[in-house]
A protein has these predicted regions:
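Loop-to-transmembrane alpha-helix initiation sites
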Residues: 145, 161-169, 190-202
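Membrane-interface helix termini and inter-helical loops of multi-pass transporters
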Residues: 2-4, 90-94, 181-193
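C-terminal membrane-associated helical module and adjoining short loops/tails
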Residues: 190-233
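Alpha-helical transmembrane segments in multi-pass membrane proteins
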Residues: 13, 17, 21-26, 30, ...
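Short, strongly hydrophobic alpha-helical membrane anchors
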Residues: 1-12
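Interfacial segments of multi-pass membrane proteins
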Residues: 56-60, 82-86, 128-158, 171-180
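Short, non-helical or kinked segments that cap or interrupt transmembrane helices
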Residues: 40-52, 120-133, 160-171
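Cytosolic, membrane-interface loops and tails of multi-pass inner-membrane proteins
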Residues: 31-64, 125, 218-233
Length: 233
C-alpha cells in the first residue's frame, strides 16, 4: 500500500524517468541512418516521416531494418531506466514496488513523444509506431500480441503501414481494458485503480499515435496513401 506522505518521494524519479525517455526518444535513427546510407534527409522524401517505413522507401531494406531495431531498443532502454529509477525510490522509501510500473509508463510515453518531436532535429520526427510497439510489449505482452496480430492482418490486406498502425492504436485502449479488468482485476485480484490507470495511459498513447497520422488519414480517404512493395529496389 502506498501512503500519501510517501508518494512525494516518487515525483523526482518519475520526472527523471520522463526526461531520460524524452532524450533517448529524440535520437532519430531514421534521420541518422538515411544520411549514412543515402546521404539524404528522410524527411525531404516520400511521406516526410522520420520512421522505418519511409527509410525503406528512401534508403532501402538494410537501413530500414536497422532503424526499426534501434528505435525499438531505445524505447526498451527508456522503459527499463524508468522502471529501475522508480523502483529504487520505492524500495528506499517503503513504497509498494508495484508502483515502479509508473516509471515505465512515464519513460515509455516520453520516449514516444521524443521520437515524434526530437529535440536534436528541430522537433520534426516520426510517428512513434515502433517506439509505441516496444512500450506496449514491455507494459503488457498479452495486449501487444493482440494488437500486433490486428496490425499484421490489416497490413497483409491493405499493404499500408499507416492504416495498420491507426487500427492497432484505436483498439489498444479497448484491449488494455478487457485484459486488465477481466483477467487481472476479476481473476487476478488487482485493484480497479490499476485498470483505470492502464486504460487511461493506453487511450492517451493510442490518441497520440492517431493524431500524428492525420495526414495519412486524409490520404487514405482520398485513396492516395502509399503502399509497401517488397520488390527489390
Amino acid at each position: 500500500m502506498i501512503y500519501r506522505e510517501n508518494f512525494g518521494s516518487l515525483i523526482l524519479p518519475l520526472l527523471l524517468s520522463a526526461l531520460v525517455g524524452y532524450l533517448l526518444g529524440s535520437i532519430s535513427f531514421a534521420i541518422l541512418l538515411t544520411k549514412a546510407f543515402a546521404h539524404e534527409d528522410v524527411r525531404a522524401h516520400g511521406s516526410g516521416n522520420a520512421g522505418a517505413t519511409n527509410v525503406l522507401r528512401v534508403a532501402g531494406k538494410k537501413a530500414s531494418a536497422l532503424t526499426f531495431l534501434l528505435d525499438f531498443c531505445k524505447c526498451v532502454a527508456s522503459v527499463l531506466v524508468g522502471y529501475f529509477l522508480v523502483k529504487h525510490a520505492c524500495v528506499a522509501n517503503g513504497v509498494d514496488p508495484e508502483m515502479a510500473r509508473l516509471g515505465m509508463y512515464a519513460a515509455g510515453f516520453c520516449c514516444m513523444i521524443g521520437h515524434m518531436y526530437p529535440l536534436y532535429f528541430g522537433f520534426r520526427g516520426g510517428k512513434g509506431v515502433v517506439t509505441t510497439a516496444a512500450m506496449m510489449l514491455l507494459l503488457d505482452w498479452r495486449v501487444f500480441l493482440i494488437c500486433f496480430a490486428v496490425f499484421l492482418l490489416v497490413f497483409l490486406k491493405k499493404r499500408m503501414v499507416s492504416l495498420s498502425s491507426i487500427t492497432a492504436a484505436a483498439i489498444y485502449p479497448v484491449v488494455t481494458f478487457c485484459m486488465t479488468y477481466f483477467v487481472d482485476c476479476c481473476v487476478g485480484g488487482l485493484p480497479v485503480l490499476y485498470v483505470v490507470m492502464a486504460t487511461l495511459v493506453a487511450a492517451l498513447i493510442g490518441a497520440t499515435v492517431i493524431i500524428k497520422h492525420r495526414a495519412n488519414i486524409k490520404r487514405i480517404r482520398n485513396g492516395t496513401e502509399s503502399t509497401i512493395s517488397f520488390k527489390k529496389k
